[in-house]
Amino acid sequence: MRKWLIGLLLILGLCAGFAQAETYVVAVDGTGDFQTLTEAAAASSTGDTILLRTGVYGEQETFPIALDHAVTIEGEDGAVLDSPRFKTMVSVTADGVTLRNIRFQVRKWGIVADVSRAMTVEDCEFVLGDEECRTSSTAIWLRGMKDCAIRRCTFRQVGICIAGDPLSDKSAGKTVLTGMCEAGEDPEYFSTHEIADCTINGRPYYYFVGQDNLTVPTDAGGLIAVECDNLTVRDIDVSDSSMGLEIARSRNVTLENVSADRCGIFGTYLVFVQGAVLRNVHVEQTNHGIDIRGSQNVVVTDSLALNCDQGVFFTHCTDCTLQDSHVQGCGFGYFGAVGNGNRIGNCTFSDNADGIYLQNEPNATITACDVRQSRVTGLRILKSSCVCTDTTVADGWTGVIYYDSHDTTIENCDFSDNASANMYLGNGRGATIRNCRFSGETKAHLEVEGTQTDMLVTQCTFTGSRADMLKAASHTLPTFTDCAWSTPGVFWTGKEWNGSTDGDAPNRNCDIVQIGREAPRADSVPYDTPEQAIDGAVNYRKENSGRYLLLSQTNWTFRLFD
């Protein structure tokens, strides 16, 4: 009898559980249970269903609409979610969420699914709602998501992006998508989904997992390929998407004759790839044109990046190469970070903010490149080491910035007509600048700041006056050997002051000679001869060791600066 009662109670409990599932109706005109999806989602519980009647759900909603429990949202034909600009529409943080038959007017991110499982998206339409919001917009972000099913959906100018967990204090040292999420350390973030019967811009949206020796059909409008060996992608156009193509955890990949223009996130994205050749890849007006992360032995050749927010990215890459390619009109032409042994050869960079930017990038090689018209810096070397040879950096703002870097050789290069400075050295150590030519219209061939340790400039030629073209706010200078100046001019470093701490001379070696750096202080003192100027400088520095001295060759006036 007792067992029978227990069984009956279990059955009644199950029935009660099923009975608790509710169906709510949302209607803009007030004929449903709620007028907004925001309210319905907040009122619903696990297992409930929300029916979204025909209408546009926009200004009245609070975005993002949070789905933190398993709920099904199903729209009637004509049910539209329309978010404001730069707003995420739906945030999913629970397992088992279903969205069906809804049109998303995307102006940033449509659905963002974070660290959850088993989301289902069926029969939905995702459309870029505003051309001005294209950059960084995407229909579906899967961030740390597993077992997602996306079926019979249509995408126009936005697509699907797959990555790892949102950034946290555990992300340090991992490959990341800067400011957004980790690239995805867990293979299941990429491989456990179902993307079926979907189209993008009227063409098939392909998702392949574990298919070796695959050649992707040329009718592809979008591509996600995971754990494929000997993958060939040839003669396809994946433009007008979020990520035109995403290839993850694959080996021996060939991309050839691929276009990925006007993509909001990345045009061509390779992550955790072992061995690839990208040939004749064209990216234009895309956020990140060619983006390679966490990969080894990737070669990008004969490719073109035009007017992208960022041109070519190599981050956390090893032994990768960019060669015989052109990057123009981008933010960073090439950005390399936290990799090792990567190479740039025979490339041209023009009219970018930074032509080449190395950050925390050891053992890089730059050979036979032409970098011109950089709006900020032609070659920026930050906390990195490299060998740069046979390269021209010209017609920009600052030619080279070498800052807080080490163990670098710059040899047989030309630096000319960079308006602010042909080369800036800040806190450098262990660099050799050999057999280079500095010329053209510029405020300085070399501008030096901070501490210089084991820095050598040798066998270089400089046009103009040494007093004009070497400028510094530094206590130490590189060592110059066998260099030639068109006009030697006056240059004096006061070496007798080095290391003096006895009170008879300044404690720091921070005097430098130059002309016309900026307006002098009102108390500048004129002298009639160089000898008088030097004597005056010595006496002044004994009393004012915290100031810089700058000597005008024109009238032998020491200009005093705090």
At which residue positions do the language-model features occur?
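Acidic Gly/Asp/Thr-rich repetitive segments characteristic of extracellular carbohydrate-active
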Residues: 23-58, 515-559
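Positively charged n-region of N-terminal signal peptides that target proteins for export
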Residues: 1-4
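Beta-solenoid repeat scaffold
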Residues: 49, 58-81, 92-100, 192-204, ...
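Short, surface-exposed, low-complexity cationic segments
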Residues: 208-229
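Sec/Tat signal peptide C-region and signal peptidase I cleavage site
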Residues: 17-21
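Extracellular beta-rich repeat passengers
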Residues: 86, 101, 106-145, 151-183, ...
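Short, T/G/N/S-enriched strand-turn elements that build extracellular solenoid repeat scaffolds
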Residues: 35-43, 58-68, 90, 195-197, ...
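Bacterial N-terminal signal peptides
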Residues: 7-15
